[in-house]
């Protein structure tokens, strides 16, 4: 790709956007020099790596690259024998730590991001060097006392001397005789020596060493003789500490250089990972996706099958990065066509469309997702050449047309099979007839060389090529005739009018001038242009009709949805009513259970035949109540499922009384209640308990009753269990208390069902269970008689019981 093509398509801006999303200086440098992949397979692999990095980004997992500075310069200086400064060593330590942490992160995610892990696996797993440097050097860059025992000792000696000197100088300042010779009662440090501000006139009164003087010369900074010895000792201690610090820095730099190869390797890997993470962020910001990468010639051979390329919802990436509203376009080149001729009004987006394709081709070559939707397909173009901006050639004193032809000449020389050629306003800026002939010849030459070509034009002769030659295809950018404005949408398969007169009207040229131009155009040929404008008008009319049809369809769909919603509301009301009936039934059942429990308690307290008979009668009444309530609930469910909702509850309307399972006629309505005639009776029921029966609703109700009756009949006709199976109770293994409770429940059920006898299996055992059972049977009001089983019945291991009737 020539520098000119990259510049004209805006490739440097893409690289700048990528670099801005990298965090390492080395990563940014690598992004700005991002290479193009040599093969289609390499491009697929690069896109897959970006896809894995994007997966990490979507999981909010950022690579741990913090703190790594521009260490390339540090490593180079150390390799030449230089001693690194403390902060430089800290940055190198950050590199070692980032390498270990990044390796650990990607190893843990190896199953999700296998390619990234393969790239990161050579990273150094140990951060021992980083630990050593960070223990010796504080984040501020100061060398820590922990760096060595010698340094700690020298610094402690220095601190002790500072304390002694400060105490001595403060004693001198407090001396009244000394104060008479001082400019002020303070001390300062000059040349690492404690000094006093002595009046120049009192110089001989304060013996010592003069280290400095004020600008006026009236004040001398004197180190008193009594402090010189301590000052010398402090200088020696500081020198020892400084020498130890330099020794530590030399030692750490040496340790760094001993591992310099690994550090350089780690830096290269981290920079590559940083670029991949930046690529993932860029793809996310562009809503970009990896296209299917085709070989350079897939679908582009004359007579070949399939699409040469297809970019769905394509957007110009630079416009997206600028935050502008971008109208997406669907760009496709179908075989056998090899050239796409884009026409339409000025400012309609023709140049944007073809440069977006060119940038997409470059991004794919560099392994970057393109600003198009999933499902897009794009060849791995061997070369991309563009002539969309000749302003640079104008500085060479070339005319616009001459500069354009020079660019075309360069492209003709470089056009090879599998290349992509982009030309904006081909052969414009000259006589239209000659320009059209030249443009057609250029296009044919490029196509014959095996290139895929995208051009923009206003020349009618080029628009007509696709009508007679399958190697060419038309596309147009839309124009809204009512608003006199472009739509920026690309439409495939047809040419577009330049709409120059409409654009002139839009920018505000005088109306008489515009009308004169329109009349002149109509009277002086331009048949293809007029046909294109008529075609645009017809398209606009059809689009309006389609919008009207879609609006009517949407209205019908919404009406149908409202009807369904109303029906669902009615059915929901039925279900809620059934639920309320179920709750009422549950309350009745609970009350009945409580009553039965009370009867049983009384029966156990007074075990008489009369009491048992009364209990059985009460149980029969309870069962009848439960059956009636269940029948009403079933009727309500049937009504909710099969009655046709509709109409309102008003006098004269036939309704189903859900809770009673009966039909009737509404006599009157009073608020939320209604009076209903059901046969010879009149009942007052809540309106919510009534379902209007309209049309076939009565048949549905009958059907519901018929089905309910059949189900009940089927239930009643169900074959009974094998003889004796329901009249047998096995109590082996139970404790006495459990046995008595089970036997009482068993006898109660059989007595209520009208059974005559039963068999209780208790086994032989120790005989205690059998004796407890028979003692209980002797006192039971349910039992008429009992005996040990016959031999064929199980002998004394069973007890046969005859129930009292």
Curated annotation (Swiss-Prot):
Q: Can you name this protein? A: Endonuclease MutS2
Pfam family name, one:
Smr
What residue stretches are annotated with the Smr domain?
Answer: 729-804
Tell me its family. Answer: Belongs to the DNA mismatch repair MutS family. MutS2 subfamily.
Name the Gene Ontology molecular function terms of this record: ATP binding; ATP hydrolysis activity; ATP-dependent DNA damage sensor activity; endonuclease activity; mismatched DNA binding; ribosomal large subunit binding; rRNA binding
Q: Which domain of life is it from?
A: Bacteria
GO biological process, any = negative regulation of DNA recombination
**InterPro entries membership:** DNA_mismatch_repair_MutS_C (IPR000432), DNA_mismatch_repair_MutS_core (IPR007696), DNA_mismatch_repair_MutS_sf (IPR036187), MSSS (IPR046893), MutS (IPR045076), MutS2 (IPR005747), P-loop_NTPase (IPR027417), Smr_dom (IPR002625)
Name the positions where ATP binds: 344-351
Q: What keywords were assigned to this record?
A: ATP-binding, DNA-binding, Endonuclease, Hydrolase, Nuclease, Nucleotide-binding, RNA-binding, rRNA-binding
Q: How is the subunit organization of this protein annotated in UniProt?
A: Homodimer. Binds to stalled ribosomes, contacting rRNA.
Its biological purpose is as follows: Endonuclease that is involved in the suppression of homologous recombination and thus may have a key role in the control of bacterial genetic diversity. Acts as a ribosome collision sensor, splitting the ribosome into its 2 subunits. Detects stalled/collided 70S ribosomes which it binds and splits by an ATP-hydrolysis driven conformational change. Acts upstream of the ribosome quality control system (RQC), a ribosome-associated complex that mediates the extraction of incompletely synthesized nascent chains from stalled ribosomes and their subsequent degradation. Probably generates substrates for RQC.
**Annotated spans, Disordered:** 705-724
**Listed EC numbers:** 3.1.-.-, 3.6.4.-
Gene symbol here is mutS2
